[in-house]
Amino acid sequence: QQQHLGVQSMATKAALGRDADYDAVINVSAFSGIVDYQPDELILTLRAGTPMHEVESTLASANQMLAFEVPDLHKILASQSAGTIGGVLATNASGPRRLTAGAARDYLLGFDAISGRGERFKSGGKVMKNVTGYDLSKLICGSYGTLAIFDEVTLKTLPKPETNISLL
């Protein structure tokens, strides 16, 4: 029997895209927490349901940041929070720094995921040059959970710049 399954954690991006009629929704909010953080190596491995405020505070404690500057759209989308890292990657959400630094998918080094058949699979690793063949990270980011459900992701981080200027 074929069913249409939706994937969500905090449902902060539910207003994006077209309306969907799901038979069931898989809530992945339990896939949460920092698995491994190596500030000296600029590598962060975490579960996909980890809230963005936790990701940002962890990185700030080591004076680091995500290069792709996650846009905080929670007020525009009428959601309670900025969401999770899995939602950011599933939508490839990237802010104004995308023009110079790149998108979220450019900093996804590797991931563990669950396919539509319920099978676990891995792609990539913990270093920048780790892909031979298809780079599934580039494909999965921005797929809105239609190709796979992220379980664990490894991201490249960057040191925070000493100065920061905003132009309004």
Where are these regions (language model features)?
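Internal, glycine-rich beta/alpha segment that forms the wall or movable "lid"
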Residues: 134
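N-terminal glycine-rich flavin-associated loop
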Residues: 1-7, 28-81, 89, 93-126, ...
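Short, acidic (Asp/Glu-rich) active-site segment that either coordinates a divalent metal cofactor
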Residues: 139-162
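Short, well-ordered secondary-structure micro-motifs within conserved domains or adaptor modules
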Residues: 21-26
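Short glycine-biased active-site loop of nucleotidyltransferases that positions the nucleotide triphosphate
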Residues: 14-20
